[in-house]
Amino acid sequence: MTSQGHGYARFRRALKSGNAHVALAAAPELRQVGLADALSLLFLIREDKPVLYDKAAVRWFAKYAAEDRYLLLRDARELIDLLDGIGRHDQVAVVRLERWLRARGYDDEADRVA
């Protein structure tokens, strides 16, 4: 297994086990963290390292915005509001984010919404 493969396996195990410390340590070793994995990490950060949530949410938003060629300003505002609500443990925001992602064809990401 390549070092990239080993790092990704360690990252995925950390996500699965809920270990934010290991996931955050493994992420920089990867060439790229996909949007779905980054969203899983965001929810893990919210639970285990809430002081890091705002910055992580901004980074996830930027990653999403760079990927979605059809993102409009009003959609960006809505997504930011949802991420803010999720950071405050608003379950309605969690449900809305899952629906929001599915409506845009981001099913893998929607499946990661905790």
Please give the residue ranges for each predicted region.
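Long, low-complexity, acidic Ser/Pro- and Gly-enriched intrinsically disordered regions
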Residues: 1-114
